[in-house]
């Protein structure tokens, strides 16, 4: 019995010493930071009462005025939390070669759809990035634009059948699902007519019914190598099977009928043809199609719904934007064209301010690929060190954006932008690992808003949540209770 007690005590003591040494990593290097809790690090409350933005803001506000960076622990995983904008510029652009990786979870063996541009690193990411960039040129956007307009008309038709109390996130998600289905897959998803269409159900399953809790997701992305060894999956099997079958049927149909379209699937087909160097496998093609679909429909619909929310709470902004939209449409014979969208500067400001207040990602992740000395310091990062860039916290810094909770599109007038540090605004990231679909995402948001503001007026309802509370179950910034508004029809000019 005594031997057992001694053994338990010894093991406990060794564990304590090891944990204490591990969690003193940053303090031993002279880096300030919140005192971590054993096993939880700085994550206490995450997924229960707190969202990632709450934790990041707490740390940012505590250290921003006195430190350029601080130590940060996601459970057991150590990261450097960067607050200095010049240092962020160094990491994302000047010294990009030292921080080219994101270090995100992927498990191609058990979950092949995780082998996509968003999650991959190294040569695989570089090859995909170089080849997929051509999908998002301005020329390609002009080619896809008529598809967006067609879905925009269907959006207003669907809205006329449900004036009154609406849940804006679902409405916007049905719109963006149909846009992505048309522009990426050449398919009619019909989510606006049928909210329970298969594409809509699968998209909702990924975003609203994730396979794992936010705590498990945090573990997977904090310890991707361990999660991969434990054979974790990110997507539900039925979601993977649906997208694999959809892509397989689309490819087979186009090859059989010799159909050629200027869209994402066509480019992926060409990158998978025999004779192409490092040609994509079928699973790799499906993985890129999936991430484009998920990123395109969910992030854009979230931005659209947040924008409608702010317009409902700020009727003066809504009316000024509607006046601009109607004036541009009148000049163009009531037709919306790719060029006419560029004639709406206030629309651009409104969307930019929405992304400032509600960036989709609470923070950006980078991982060092080599030893790196932080400029103007003695701190040397080891290869594999993780970096956190707190986008949401930066966007809510009152020194950068006075009264940050106020929705104020004038922050994005040209002279205001010029007066700010260029890295004070990071909704799409920066540098070679910025969001490849930025142009497409903003364009479909603007098209949707133009059609909605042309025909409808939005205001708060009894169910409107003020202020909005973010869902603690999701890493992305999304609402807990939805975006409930009142929608009234307007007479067309």
Swiss-Prot record:
Heme binds at residue 435. This is Probable cytochrome P450 6a13. PANTHER family: CYTOCHROME P450 (PTHR24292), CYTOCHROME P450 6A16, ISOFORM B-RELATED (PTHR24292:SF100). It comes from Drosophila melanogaster. Belongs to the cytochrome P450 family. Pfam families: p450 (PF00067). GO terms for biological process: defense response to bacterium. Its cofactor is heme. Its EC number is 1.14.-.-. It is found in: Endoplasmic reticulum membrane; Microsome membrane. One of its GO terms (molecular function) is iron ion binding. One of its GO terms (cellular component) is endoplasmic reticulum membrane. The keyword DNA damage does not apply. InterPro entries: Cyt_P450, Cyt_P450_CS, Cyt_P450_E_grp-I, Cyt_P450_sf, Insect_CytP450_Detox. May be involved in the metabolism of insect hormones and in the breakdown of synthetic insecticides. It is a peripheral membrane protein. The gene is Cyp6a13. Keywords: Endoplasmic reticulum, Heme, Iron, Membrane, Metal-binding, Microsome, Monooxygenase, Oxidoreductase. Gene3D superfamilies: Cytochrome P450 (1.10.630.10). It comes from the Eukaryota. The keyword Endoplasmic reticulum applies.
């Amino acid at each position: 019995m005594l031997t057992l007690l001694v053994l338990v005590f010894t093991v406990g003591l060794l564990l304590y010493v090891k944990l204490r040494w591990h969690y003193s990593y940053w303090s031993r290097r002279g880096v300030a930071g919140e005192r971590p809790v054993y096993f939880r690090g700085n994550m206490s409350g995450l997924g229960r009462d707190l969202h990632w933005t709450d934790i990041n803001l707490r740390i940012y506000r505590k250290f921003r005025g006195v430190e350029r960076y601080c130590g940060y622990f996601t459970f057991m995983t150590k990261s450097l939390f960067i607050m200095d904008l010049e240092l962020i510029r160094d990491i994302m652009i000047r010294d990009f070669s030292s921080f080219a990786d994101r270090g995100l979870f992927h498990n191609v063996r058990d979950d092949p759809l995780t082998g996509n541009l968003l999650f991959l690193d190294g040569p695989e990411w570089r090859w995909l990035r170089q080849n997929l960039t051509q999908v998002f040129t301005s020329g390609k956007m002009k080619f896809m634009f008529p598809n967006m307009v067609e879905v925009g008309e269907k959006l207003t038709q669907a809205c006329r059948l449900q004036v009154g109390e609406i849940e804006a996130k679902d409405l916007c998600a049905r719109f963006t699902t149909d846009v992505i289905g048309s522009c990426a897959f050449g398919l009619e998803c019909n989510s606006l007519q049928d909210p329970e269409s298969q594409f809509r159900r699968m998209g909702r399953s990924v975003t609203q019914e994730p396979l794992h809790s936010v705590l498990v997701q945090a573990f997977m992305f904090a310890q991707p190598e361990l999660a991969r060894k434990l054979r974790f999956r990110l997507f539900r099997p039925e979601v993977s099977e649906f997208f694999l079958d959809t892509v397989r049927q689309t490819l087979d149909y186009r090859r059989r009928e010799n159909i050629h379209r200027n869209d994402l699937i066509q480019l992926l087909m060409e990158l998978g043809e025999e004779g192409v160097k490092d040609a994509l496998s079928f699973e790799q093609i499906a993985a890129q199609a999936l991430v484009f679909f998920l990123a395109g429909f969910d992030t854009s619909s979230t931005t659209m719904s947040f924008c409608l929310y702010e317009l409902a709470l700020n009727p003066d902004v809504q009316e000024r934007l509607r006046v601009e939209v109607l004036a541009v449409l009148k000049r163009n014979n009531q037709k919306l064209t790719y060029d006419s969208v560029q004639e709406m500067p206030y629309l651009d400001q409104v969307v930019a301010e929405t992304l400032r207040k509600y960036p989709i990602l609470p923070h950006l992740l980078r991982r060092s690929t080599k030893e790196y000395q932080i400029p103007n310091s003695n701190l040397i990062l080891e290869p594999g060190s993780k970096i956190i860039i707190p986008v949401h916290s930066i966007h809510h810094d009152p020194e950068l954006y006075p009264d940050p909770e106020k929705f104020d599109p004038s922050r994005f007038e040209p002279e205001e932008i010029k007066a700010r540090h260029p890295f004070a605004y990071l909704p799409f990231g920066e540098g070679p690992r910025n969001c490849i679909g930025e142009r497409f995402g903003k364009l479909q948001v603007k098209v949707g808003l133009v059609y909605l503001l042309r025909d409808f007026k939005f205001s708060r309802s009894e169910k409107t949540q003020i202020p909005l509370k973010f869902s603690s179950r999701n890493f992305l910034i999304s609402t807990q209770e939805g975006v409930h508004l009142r929608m009234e029809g307007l007479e067309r000019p």
